Amino acid sequence: MTADVPNARLVDVELDESIGRSTPDVEHERAVAIFDLIEENSFHPVGDQKGGPYRLKLSLMESRLIFSITRENGDAVATHILSLTPLRRVVRDYFMICESYYQAIRSATPSKIEAIDMGRRGLHNEGSQTLQARLKGKIEVDFDTARRLFTLVCVLHWRG
């Protein structure tokens, strides 16, 4: 349990820069998600007794999501590689609803925007729960941390 481990949190998050940059909107989402994640998170690699704080590098390679975890001083802690297959549908649906949302905020009624946003939040929650389940036994995260990590997974997809 993260409460028993000192400094079970992230102090730095980096996305694989080799994928390249995306649109200003996506880059803004990335920056906000990283800021929010660093400000408040619960993150503990299972089996690590020394505790954090931790640095995380997220990258994509051959349809796999790679979590490279080090201590604040750079010492390696763990690398976890997850298949993206369980997340593909929800990420695809999330992209589609985000596109609808961005179009709606330009011309739709407030009630239509609110309805689309509720659907977007629901899909975001679903993706967060799926990611949290995929990390179980590897990295302990709370739901809010999983939500912010899911946002970053989506940013990697947008860029990749």
Swiss-Prot record:
Highest taxon listed in the record's lineage: Bacteria
InterPro entries recorded: UCP032146
Pfam families: UPF0262 (PF06793)
Family stated for the protein in its record: Belongs to the UPF0262 family.
Descriptive protein name: UPF0262 protein BCAN_A0255
Protein species of origin: Brucella canis (strain ATCC 23365 / NCTC 10854 / RM-666)
Source organism phylogeny: Bacteria, Pseudomonadati, Pseudomonadota, Alphaproteobacteria, Hyphomicrobiales
